[in-house]
Amino acid sequence: MPEISLRHVVSCSSQDSTHCAENLLKADTYRKWRAAKAGEKTISVVLQLEKEEQIHSVDIGNDGSAFVEVLVGSSAGGATAGEQDYEVLLVTSSFMSPSESRSGSNPNRVRIFGPDKLVRAAAEKRWDRVKIVCSQPYSKDSPYGLSFVKFHSPPDKDEAEATSQKVTVTKLGQFRVKEEDDSANSLKPGALFFSRINKTSSASTSDPAGPSYAAATLQASSAASSASPVPKVVGSSSKPQEPPKGKRKLDLSLEDRKPPSKPSAGPSTLKRPKLSVPSRTPAAAPASTPAQRAVPGKPRGEGTEPRGARTGPQELGKILQGVVVVLSGFQNPFRSELRDKALELGAKYRPDWTPDSTHLICAFANTPKYSQVLGLGGRIVRKEWVLDCHHMRRRLPSRRYLMAGLGSSSEDEGDSHSESGEDEAPKLPQKRPQPKAKTQAAGPSSPPRPPTPKETKAPSPGPQDNSDTEGEESEGRDNGAEDSGDTEDELRRVAKQREQRQPPAPEENGEDPYAGSTDENTDSETPSEADLPIPELPDFFEGKHFFLYGEFPGDERRRLIRYVTAFNGELEDYMNERVQFVITAQEWDPNFEEALMENPSLAFVRPRWIYSCNEKQKLLPHQLYGVVPQA
């Protein structure tokens, strides 16, 4: 598209002595046009073109302006034409946001406005005068203007045909390269490559029915490979079955078109069956081999190879689906990279621990979130879990990455069950008699226990994860290996044994006159405190959003976060429109007035309101604890 040349500056509302409006007529980008002083609301300049032209596109380089508008007019009305003689060519367009204007960042943004961005009625006419209006209402610290402006006319048909004809003969120094193909006028990216493939395929197949037959065999081979990928696993070291000689060239051309993702997925899929072979027991191996010979497609369809073959970039967002992560102890930029990788794998992110959170990714122990989640019974893992899942492109069991101090087998095996179902095929028959194993494990050897707060309160990520966790609990009890590591079960057993040993002691002495009645009531009628379920916390802060402002003495900030989270409240990291209550230990601040102007429903309260609600175990009126401006 040819560039429209500018003749001179007709008028200018404001210009600097150094950065004058005539700089827009020059091609150098470092020559700018700026206002005479800072703080001007709008500035404008009128430029005269060489002749009447139809404007096809506009290129504008900014220099601190927030908005730019382009109008067009005709010099037939005289140099002192009014505003009514100008028509809008480009509506007011934004070049800097309010935050960028106040901070002074990105002042030299360049935008190209094509014919689809211009007003059609004005772009179809011919003009010889252009008026540019710039404004900056957000910043009054520095002058603003434009770096450059360029106008382009629509390309001519003769020039387009001339350029298309010049493509056929190209001169490189003293040599001239001539195209042999007659269809060189309509060259497209990749056209020569595909024409070469068509030539080789037509030369190899003489009959005209060849391409349709090759397409049919291609569809049949792709359907067979997607239905049963068994030969890839069996003959991992050998080459795949050779096609007929007549179609070999066609298959070679198709292999060139295959994406490089399948060869990269090959080594990972070949290594995984080797890991599952030693886990088979000698008794289960001979029983499984006849079943594999009889029905070769079914067990391999349930194994690792189809899942490994399907695992690719298109399923990357489903690897950690249903997982809600919270980060603790990391600093930027690694914190943002770790969060982006978790979100890329399909997980959800929370800034603080919420009831729907499933994993706390901690850099080191003894952080405030670490202590909070450890007290609530959550799962705390290292950062390597997310990094390895992202690197391996599959979900790994989180129990391998648990931080020190957590030994809950039922929670740890929840992930291992879902992963073992994907990784190890021989374990599937062992998990089918699940109800029997659960009833046997719940026999006299293991006394019944009430549900813990984790089982009653913590919501499960999904129905599938819940069933997987129960299945792994029953399997862990059958094996008996993980039962010793369950700290809560051991504490309950020890407490119950102590209660069973304590009643006979006063009866043997016989000196306590109140021993008989209290023992009978304790053993037969009232249950012990250890058998009672832990009461659930009230959720009177549900649906309320809090923001902690200012400094708090000692560990008061940690206590406030703990109470708000315990009563199902939401804590915001920064001030936004969702905040309803601002908790502060300071007096009235001038910033509170600005916040009230933007959000009149805000309430500024003392920390004592949170403590009083905790003592009364109900929601108290916050007006009694409000922060008001001093007279």
Swiss-Prot record:
PTM annotation (Phosphoserine): residues: 142, 201, 206, 228, 261, 371, 408-410, 445-446, 460, 484, 517
Positions bearing Phosphothreonine: 200, 281, 452, 456, 487, 518, 522
Subcellular location: Nucleus; Chromosome
Swiss-Prot/TrEMBL GO biological process terms: base-excision repair; DNA repair; double-strand break repair via nonhomologous end joining; hippocampus development; negative regulation of protection from non-homologous end joining at telomere; regulation of base-excision repair; response to hydroperoxide; single strand break repair
Knockout-associated phenotype: Embryonic lethal. Conditional knockout in brain causes cerebellar histopathology including increased apoptosis of cerebellar granule neurons, reduced numbers of cerebellar interneurons and decreased electrophysiological spike activity in Purkinje cells. Mutant mice exhibit cerebellar ataxia and elevated levels of ADP-ribose in cerebellum. Double knockout with PARP1 restores the normal interneuron density and ADP-ribose levels, reducing cerebellar ataxia in comparison to the single XRCC1 knockout mice.
CDD domains in alphabetical order: BRCT_XRCC1_rpt1, BRCT_XRCC1_rpt2
Signal peptide: none
Keyword set includes Membrane: no
Compositional bias annotation for Low complexity: 225-238, 278-294
Cross-link Glycyl lysine isopeptide (Lys-Gly) (interchain with G-Cter in SUMO2): where in chain: 178
SUPFAM superfamilies: BRCT domain, Galactose-binding domain-like
Ranges for domain BRCT: 315-403, 536-627
Chief location bin: nucleus
Family annotation (Pfam families): BRCT, BRCT_2, XRCC1_N
Basic and acidic residues composition-biased segments: 242-259, 299-308, 415-426, 490-501
Key words of the record: Chromosome, DNA damage, DNA repair, Isopeptide bond, Nucleus, Phosphoprotein, Repeat, Ubl conjugation
Function: Scaffold protein involved in DNA single-strand break repair by mediating the assembly of DNA break repair protein complexes. Negatively regulates ADP-ribosyltransferase activity of PARP1 during base-excision repair in order to prevent excessive PARP1 activity. Recognizes and binds poly-ADP-ribose chains: specifically binds auto-poly-ADP-ribosylated PARP1, limiting its activity.
Subunit structure of this chain's protein: Homodimer. Interacts with polynucleotide kinase (PNK), DNA polymerase-beta (POLB) and DNA ligase III (LIG3). Interacts with APTX and APLF. Interacts with APEX1; the interaction is induced by SIRT1 and increases with the acetylated form of APEX1. Interacts with (poly-ADP-ribosylated) PARP1.
Protein name as it appears in the record: DNA repair protein XRCC1
Organism: Mus musculus (Mouse)
Gene behind the chain: Xrcc1
